[in-house]
Curated annotation (Swiss-Prot):
Membrane-spanning ranges: 60-80, 81-101, 248-268, 283-303, 716-736, 774-794, 809-829, 848-868, 880-900
CDD domains in the record: P-type_ATPase_cation
Organism ancestry: Bacteria, Bacillati, Cyanobacteriota, Cyanophyceae, Synechococcales
GO cellular-component term (any): plasma membrane
Primary location recorded for the protein, binned into one broad class: membrane
Alphabetical UniProt keywords: ATP-binding, Cell membrane, Magnesium, Membrane, Nucleotide-binding, Phosphoprotein, Translocase, Transmembrane, Transmembrane helix
Pfam annotation, one family: Hydrolase
GO molecular function, one term: ATP hydrolysis activity
Catalytic activity reported: ATP + H2O = ADP + phosphate + H(+)
Taxonomic source organism: Synechocystis sp. (strain ATCC 27184 / PCC 6803 / Kazusa)
Gene: pma1
SUPFAM superfamilies in UniProt: Calcium ATPase, transduction domain A (SSF81653), Calcium ATPase, transmembrane domain M (SSF81665), HAD-like (SSF56784), Metal cation-transporting ATPase, ATP-binding domain N (SSF81660)
Protein name per UniProt: Cation-transporting ATPase pma1
Membrane topology: Multi-pass membrane protein
Length: 905
């Protein structure tokens, strides 16, 4: 027997009775043990199923799947075949070091999917064979009758059959901060996920009331499961840096293979021995490969990680460090990211006057200001008017939630909206405990969707009914209203509705408050007591407010040329209001789209909408992913922030996924490239700054490393063409490219940021790794290095008639010149003279640079003076006069370095 799954039917569009009939479920008895066993066999357990990740050994082997490493592996193998085992082991060692570095960098991508299982594991109350049982959520099957109560996590996707004041927090799925009040009525087929009131989805939480539903989807068929499947389909995107390195590597591979083959063919054709020509070809290949570059890149990124950690941004995947610096768009979830995720009363209308309330979140600290008009400053109130006090008092009395002081923070136990009312009353000096003794509650009418209000009966100075609810439900029941001076007049519904409209346009959720005095013998209340005779007390407008520091961060992003787009599951009016408050959307910028509009768009139209608008509301998880992809197709480097399960696929797809470390779900964290430990959007701006600094320093490293490779390659190629002895051997090249280069280049990773780095526009994502200016620099310095190596080698060889000494002095002269070039490159964009005169930075900040130079010098001394190094690298010891000669190239390097800085500032 086949049973429907989530993908088979739109359950919100079908009557509950029809679904029960299709599932052969008796709503009074539930499933039988036999039926449960059959469905276990057909559907399996209610747990998410995932593709297994790559094993560790395979991830390690894949590190060798790089074009440049192919050359080294082949060269080492041929060397071994020819009997040059020392050379072979050194070359293989270089490839192994690079593979280990890459393996360490490998992200734990499978962790994101595995954490989804944790997000939905819970217990459930289920009706089977007429008995209510408490079972693990994994044991649920389609057709089970499940009961929900306050505090429960929804264990599977349910079509609701009965509800009693049921409210569900679906923020992890939809981004909606306010719990959703559930119902059982049929809904239109096109109803978006966030508005399916007759459904309860796996992974959401019950905040209030009770309900009963039938399981219509389990495991991967749930909405949560659909998210996991979409994540499995996501390919881990390359960051701009890794894309550029891949392109650079392939280009370099073709050039190296061509030149090596050309070198071998020309040398052999001129009568050279195949063995010698192979040594020349290997030396050329090894010299052209910047072996130290992967290690330098890793160290530079790791230093960026450390700097970001100090600024509350934890990097999970190293390439994301640099990618942040090239971000052109930040797509942010609203709830809990740009906003506090704590409902806060910000405006009150009472007695015909308007008041603003300061303070954020659930903290009882704040002040009341009377709004005097556009051209007059607001007035801070010393004492509150009676009608304002009465309005606030009603919000606290007519309330089933509580505020708790947890360390430095305040939290609500219960409904967030009621928490906001408690906080606003506490700011006026009211205490829940105090009011409970002064005005004890005698009876209450809980909030119901049919009536849209809650009422409580209290004793005290007479018996009074206090009511809170929607404006529509209370206005029709009110006959009079209190003015500021305590005078009671006939209610002016038109004026109140105008004020409600004004507050709604600010993105505020508005509740109305009223009271009614009853006879002393009144011990209980019913809906009949609320029908007429209410006295209108006022309105309270609340919102999940923007974080103040996030507002500043949005402006900083704009200054840096980065667009900020809000993608949320919230209402469009609320999203637009928040966007305007934060500066995401300018005044008068009305371009905003809802999920239902996006669903009707084709790919081209969607891409244009993603480009033009900065506010997207009522967006489903799949649409968040589509928006990120659309922006990427437009050429943007996209950073996506989020904290809910609904954000996970988009976080994984984005060039940089940014999750909240405190308030975020485990799924979002595991899907991300970066975590914000303080859940502060402002930390993104700091991370972007560090990302730009990382790229700046990587560029310096490339500008320093490649001219050496260029000089070495030119030296070997020209020597073969002219049938001369090789001035430098393959093992000596590896020493220069790995040991010396890494020692001297790593200090560049510690360079401070350039002034005004956050006032620059984002880099063009299509800009190549080697720009024209950088290429000119590389060619100039490569030419100098070739002249230096070749000239020193020829002079020493003719003077001393010693090949080993000639090669040793050529290398030492090159390293001496590199010291000057390093000093110039370390202040790229400024003159070399600026460093000498101390204008660049203090000696303390340059200490790492000087340490790197000192270590490099010590290693070079050992390279030529230690006997075992002479044997391994075929070098020769030098006397002090020869050392002095090797220092002379430092002098001509000064003007070359200055010219290079002018070519590539």
């Amino acid at each position: 027997m086949d049973f429907p799954t989530l993908s088979s039917y739109l359950h919100h569009h079908r009557p509950g009775e029809d679904i029960l009939a299709d599932l052969h479920t008796d709503p009074g008895l539930g499933l039988t043990a036999e039926a449960v066993a059959q469905r276990y066999e057909q559907y399996g357990r209610n747990e998410l199923k995932f593709k297994p990740g790559k094993p560790a050994w395979l991830r390690f082997l894949l590190q060798f799947h790089q074009p440049l490493l192919y050359i080294l592996l082949i060269a080492g193998t041929v060397k071994a075949f020819l009997g040059s085992w020392t050379n072979a082991w050194v070359i293989w060692g270089v490839t192994l070091v690079n593979a280990i570095i890459g393996y360490i960098q490998e992200a734990k991508a499978e962790g994101a999917i595995a954490s989804l299982a944790k997000a939905v594991t819970t217990e459930a109350t289920v009706l089977r064979d007429g008995q209510n049982l408490r079972i693990p959520s994994q044991d649920l099957v389609i057709g089970d009758i499940v009961s929900l109560a306050s505090g429960d996590k929804v264990p599977a996707d349910l079509r609701l059959l009965k509800v009693r004041n049921l409210q569900v927090d679906e923020s992890a799925l939809t981004g909606e901060a306010v719990p959703v009040e559930k119902a059982v009525e049929l809904l239109p087929e096109e109803t978006p996920l966030a508005e399916r009131l007759n459904m309860a989805y796996a992974g959401s939480f019950v905040t209030f009331g009770q309900g009963t539903g039938v399981v219509v989807a389990t495991a991967n068929a749930t909405e949560m499961g659909q998210i996991s499947q979409s994540m499995e389909k996501q390919v881990s995107l390359m960051t701009p840096l890794t894309r550029k390195f891949a392109k650079f590597s392939h280009t370099l591979l073709y050039v190296i293979v061509t030149l090596a083959a050309f070198t071998f063919a020309v040398g052999w054709g001129r009568g050279g021995s195949p063995l010698e020509m192979f040594e020349a070809a290997v030396a050329l290949a090894v010299s052209a490969i910047p072996e130290g570059l992967p290690a330098v890149v890793t160290v530079t990124l790791a230093i960026g990680v450390n700097r970001m950690a100090k600024r509350n941004a934890i990097i999970r995947k190293l390439p994301a460090v640099e990618a942040l610096g090239s971000a052109t768009v930040v797509c942010s979830d609203k709830t809990g990211t740009l906003t506090e995720n704590q409902m806060t009363v910000q405006a009150v209308y009472a007695g015909g006057k308007h008041y603003e309330v300061s303070g954020g979140g659930y903290s009882p600290k704040g002040e009341f200001w009377q709004v005097m008009g556009e051209e007059v400053d607001n007035v801070l109130l010393d004492g509150l008017p009676p009608v304002l006090e009465e309005c606030l008092l009603t919000g606290m009395l007519c309330n089933d939630s509580q505020l708790e002081h947890r360390g430095d923070d305040w939290a609500v136990v219960g409904d967030p909206t009621e928490g906001a009312l408690l906080a606003s009353a506490a700011k006026a000096g009211f205490s829940q405990a105090g009011l409970a003794s002064q005005k004890p509650r005698l009876d209450s009418i809980p909030f119901e969707s049919d009536y849209q209000y809650m009422a409580t009966l209290h004793d005290g100075d007479g018996r009074t009914i206090y009511v809170k609810g929607s404006v529509e439900s209370l206005l029709q029941r009110c006959e009079s209203m209190l003015l500021d001076d305590g005078q009671m007049v006939s209610i002016d519904r038109g004026e109140i509705e105008e004020n409600v409209e004004d507050m709604a346009q600010q993105g505020l959720r508005v509740l109305a408050f009223a009271k009614k005095t009853v006879e002393p013998h009144h011990h209980a209340i019913d809906h009949g007591d609320i029908e007429t005779g209410l006295i209108f007390l006022g309105l309270q407008g609340m919102i999940d407010p923007p974080r103040p520091e996030a507002i500043a961060a949005v402006h900083a992003c704009h200054d840096a040329g980065i667009e900020v787009k809000m993608i949320t599951g919230d209402h469009i009016s609320t999203a637009q209001a928040i966007a305007k408050r934060m500066g995401i959307a300018a005044e008068g910028d009305g371009i905003a789209f809802e999920g239902r509009q996006l669903a009707t768009m084709g790919p081209a139209e969607l891409a244009q909408a993603a480009e033009d608008s900065c506010v997207f509301a009522r967006v489903a998880p799949a649409q968040k992913l589509q928006l990120v992809e659309a922006l990427q197709e437009k050429g943007h480097i996209v950073a996506m922030t989020g904290d809910g399960v609904n954000d996970a696929p988009a976080l994984k797809r984005a060039d940089i996924g940014i999750a909240m470390g405190k308030g975020g779900t485990e799924v979002a964290r595991e899907s991300s490239d970066m975590l914000l430990t303080d859940d502060n959007f402002a930390s993104i701006e700091a991370a972007v700054e560090e990302g730009r600094t990382v790229y700046q320093n990587l560029r310096k490293a490339i500008a320093f490393l490649l001219p050496v490779n260029g000089g070495e390659s030119m030296t070997i190629l020209i020597s073969v063409l002219l049938a001369l002895n090789l001035p430098i051997l393959s093992l000596q090249v590896l020493w220069l490219n790995m040991i010396n280069s890494i020692t001297m280049t790593v200090p560049l990773a510690f360079e401070a940021k350039s002034p005004g780095i956050m006032q620059q526009a984002p880099r063009n994502p299509n800009e190549p790794l080697i720009t024209k200016k950088l290429l000119h620099r590389i060619l100039l310095v490569s030419l100098f290095n070739w002249i230096l190596i070749f000239g020193m080698f020829e002079w020493v060889n003719r003077t001393y008639d010693d090949l080993a000494l000639a090669r040793t002095m050529a290398i030492q002269a090159l390293v001496a010149a590199r010291v000057i070039y390093l000093l110039s490159i370390s202040q790229l964009g400024r003159s070399f003279l600026g460093y000498v005169t101390g204008k660049r930075q203090t000696i303390t900040k340059a200490s790492i640079l000087l340490l790197g130079i000192a270590v490099a010098i010590a290693l070079q001394i050992g390279f030529s003076q230690l006997p075992f190094m002479n044997v391994l690298f075929k070098t020769a010891p030098m006397d002090w006069q020869q050392w002095a000669i090797c220092l002379l190239p430092m002098i001509p390097m000064v003007p070359v370095a200055i010219l290079a800085n002018r070519l590539d500032p």
